[in-house]
Amino acid sequence: MTGIAVQLYTLRNEMEQDFYGVLEKVKELGFEAVEWAGLYGHPVAEVAAFAGKLGLKSAALHVSLDRLNGEIEAVIAEAHALGATRVVCPYVDQKYHSPDGYRAVRKELEAAAKTLSAAGLAFSYHHHDFELATEVDGRSALEYLLDGDGISAELDLYWLKKGGRDPLAFLQPYAGRVPLMHVKDMSDDAAQSFAEVGTGSIDFAPILAWGQAGGTEWFIVEQDVCPGNALDSVAISIANLRKLLNK
């Protein structure tokens, strides 16, 4: 059964003010797990103990390419302490947004994946829309990166649609290779802005069914920008997502 998590980047402003209070609220809203986007200076052992007491699991850690390249042993220790089994690279800098840049990045990601695998951790890449705008060796840069050894996908439904792709169609070749999915809606207007799940233009039902059948472990709510209080936005998203999943 695919679980429901939240990407804590969504709640970054709230977490800066009340890190542990936000974790409590996330649990109260019904999230089973979180996807970490930094610990805001809190000791990892303290965070792990607090999350464990709440019963909040760790879906994954988002870790920058710089950290993967420069301090991967610390990343491994952090993941193990938090009880996470997956590490995700969330973004690559603009300097890499060219065919040669993506070729270099894939080598770095493959090296990180190999080191993480030896430590019992799986690796995924999270994309935006820019990887769909560049072609590498006859396919999009995203598809090129996902062809790398040891690189699973964290596919983001909003960014697939923003990049001009049909999310459900794009998913089809990746059955069994999308353990993490960012469930994110797009406003049904010309602005194509971020929206709470179930309030926009994305048809989630067939996508969620595909994920459940295709081995997705976590449906992860994320909203890069919220119109008001981000906790209110994720509350709407999880309520609608649970209805879609009959949870």
Named regions from a protein language model:
Residues 24, 33, 65-153, 160-162, ...:
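Active-site acidic/histidine proton-transfer and metal-coordination neighborhood
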Residues 5-17, 61-69, 96-101:
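Active-site mouth loops of central-metabolism enzymes
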Residues 44-62, 74:
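Aromatic-lined substrate-binding rim segments of carbohydrate-active enzymes
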Residues 5, 35, 60-62, 88, ...:
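Conserved beta-strand positions in the central sheet of alpha/beta enzyme cores
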Residues 1-28, 52, 80-83, 117, ...:
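Histidine-acidic metal/acid-base catalytic patches
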Residues 9-11, 37-39, 62-66, 92-94, ...:
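Active-site beta-loop-alpha junctions enriched in small/polar residues
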Residues 31, 35-51:
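Glycine-rich, proline-tolerant flexible connector loops at the mouths of alpha/beta enzymes
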